[in-house]
């Protein structure tokens, strides 16, 4: 698996930034510009996302192994892990598997998506998810000359900020794995509650949320943890970067690492 890593800044603490669909490490440009004076900022690009290079969908275990290898490569100390969208799903799985490697966790817009959440999701919201996720999942196996234009159209409808020319059907493997992965589907049977301090930030300008209110309440009640809503869409770090950066900075400044 190819690993694309960008490192900026010289701070004592390392922030590892992990994007989702249909992005790359470029998503975090405004955050790196703001944080690199005080933190070592590491941007990872998911396997197969930088170019259409991934020939198969990765299992959750494989993604977690890739993430562990990448984090150990950039830091021998526990890191601050900041993740969005599918990156958040993968980050939560990583924290489950390697809690000792994450000092603080910042999850963005995607919360716990275990079976309990999906069962309780209203039918209307399930159909909305189906409307874009299933075409992306199916397109992963279609010829790229058809699949990539379809992927770009869906990204445009969802107002994804990534440059259209950077978007391709190879980015759709998480949806394929989630829908058609069989025994290796991306699905957890247990609720995710981290053992480290967590900041969870979500945008309110969306048809529905990717977490249950009860889960957010549990996160907010954890020691040194916080849940913050922003008047922004799914990509709040792009929609309102100054406000987002302030929220992250203030939380990091007053939050100690997990013991």
Predicted regions and their residues:
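Catalytic histidine-centered segment of alpha/beta-hydrolase-like enzymes
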Residues: 232-241, 245
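Flexible "cap/lid" subdomain of the alpha/beta-hydrolase fold that forms the substrate-access gate
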Residues: 42, 49-75, 79-82, 86-229
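Conserved HGGG/HGGXW glycine-rich cap/lid loop of the alpha/beta-hydrolase fold
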Residues: 7-51
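Glycine-rich phosphate-binding loop signature in dinucleotide/nucleotide-binding domains
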Residues: 9-10, 71-77, 251, 255
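Residue-level signal for the nucleotide or nucleotide-sugar donor/cofactor binding architecture
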Residues: 23, 58, 62, 239
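A short loop-to-beta-strand scaffold at the N-terminal edge of the catalytic core in hydrolase folds
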Residues: 1-7
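Generic structural signal for small/hydrophobic residues in well-ordered secondary structure
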Residues: 5, 19-20, 28, 35, ...
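Hydrophobic residues on the short alpha-helix immediately C-terminal to a glycine-rich phosphate/catalytic loop
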Residues: 31, 94, 247-251
